[in-house]
């Protein structure tokens, strides 16, 4: 991937503090807004331990994330409690003790136009 495209994606991921997570699986199609924080190209979300999203992720790790500024497709991984030594501000959110950390490894990001509708640019983050 070109350095400028990677940097553009990293900058876009840093902006939102919340993102809508969309999953599908045995619990059906699920969409919910959760707190998030990025480290480099990895995006971390706090998802309640009782969420149907986690059940879906156990069966299918493909996810889509949405914010006002971008749409992202990627692979999610549930990080078991106590396993991570990440220093995330996200872990200090109110109610974080009732949540599980989910890491999303992005495959593709579509940055939206600031005015109007549609996408301004698409960045492929993985080459398959």
What is each of the regions a protein language model found here?
Residues 16-49, 55-57, 63-67:
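Short beta-strand segments
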Residues 1-19, 123:
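Extreme N-terminal tail/first-helix region
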Residues 8-9, 33, 92:
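Short, flexible, glycine/charge-rich loop motifs used to bind or transfer phosphoryl groups or to couple energy/partner
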Residues 97, 123-128:
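Short, cationic low-complexity segments
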Residues 50-117:
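Short, structured beta-strand-loop surface elements
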Residues 6-10, 21-24, 50-51, 96-98:
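Intrinsically disordered, low-complexity segments enriched in polar/charged residues with Gly/Pro
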Residues 2-6, 47, 85:
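Charged, amphipathic alpha-helical segments
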């Amino acid at each position: 991937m070109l350095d400028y495209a990677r940097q553009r994606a990293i900058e876009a991921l840093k902006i939102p503090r919340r993102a809508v997570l969309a999953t599908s699986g045995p619990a059906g199609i699920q969409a919910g807004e959760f707190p998030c924080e990025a480290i480099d190209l990895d995006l971390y979300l706090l998802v309640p331990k009782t969420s149907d999203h986690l059940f879906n992720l156990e069966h299918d790790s493909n996810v889509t994330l949405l914010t006002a500024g971008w749409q992202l497709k990627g692979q999610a991984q549930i990080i078991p409690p106590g396993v991570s030594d990440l220093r995330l501000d996200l872990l200090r959110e109110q109610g974080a003790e009732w949540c599980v950390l989910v890491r999303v490894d992005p495959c593709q990001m579509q940055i939206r136009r600031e005015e109007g509708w549609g996408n301004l640019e698409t960045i492929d983050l993985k080459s398959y």
